[in-house]
């Protein structure tokens, strides 16, 4: 039988580790965000098979994004996030009313748990105005 093919996961950092690998390692492989369920080991918790991605092949999150209007949209991304371009693309494709907020000095995973960086004030202002 053929062996399963898994997405590459970083279990330890090396001199060749990319900035994205370092950022995700810092969250998912440290007490900051690592979770190992009973019966598993840390080395087996983040190994989705490549076939796990098939469900995304028929999903395009920007399809018909303009039809959300006239409901307001707030896109938030870290200014240093590798994923920032996705928020910028969504913002560009969305109809008004819309807003793009870049969090200064924040990367992608910083907005998971770094409460000093999460823009709670911006969220409150947006929801107070948008949920009238």
Regions found by a protein language model. Give the residues of each.
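Extended, charge-rich helix/loop segments that form flexible
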Residues: 10-41
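Conserved loop-alpha-helix segment in the C-terminal half of the alpha/beta-hydrolase fold
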Residues: 80-98
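Active-site nucleophile elbow and catalytic-triad environment of alpha/beta-hydrolase enzymes
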Residues: 48-65
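Catalytic active-site module of serine/aspartate enzymes centered on a nucleophile-bearing elbow/loop
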Residues: 106-109, 113-132
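Catalytic histidine neighborhood in serine/cysteine hydrolases
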Residues: 95-109
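Short, small-residue-biased leader/transition segments that mark boundaries at the very start
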Residues: 2-6
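Short beta-strand/loop motif that positions the catalytic acidic residue
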Residues: 74-77
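Short, conserved loop/helix-junction motifs that constitute active-site signature segments
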Residues: 66-69, 93-95
């Amino acid at each position: 039988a053929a062996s399963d093919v898994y997405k590459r996961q970083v279990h330890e950092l090396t001199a060749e580790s990319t900035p994205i690998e370092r950022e995700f390692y810092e969250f998912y492989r440290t007490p900051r965000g690592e979770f190992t369920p009973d019966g598993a080991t840390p080395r087996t918790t983040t190994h989705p098979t490549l076939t796990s991605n098939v469900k995304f092949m028929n999903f395009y999150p920007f399809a018909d994004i303009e039809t959300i209007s006239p409901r307001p949209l707030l896109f938030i991304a870290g200014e240093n996030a590798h994923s920032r371009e996705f928020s910028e693309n969504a913002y560009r494709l969305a109809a008004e009313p819309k807003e793009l907020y870049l969090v200064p000095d924040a990367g992608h995973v910083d907005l998971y748990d770094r409460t000093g960086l999460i823009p709670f004030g911006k969220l409150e202002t947006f929801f107070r105005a948008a949920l009238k």
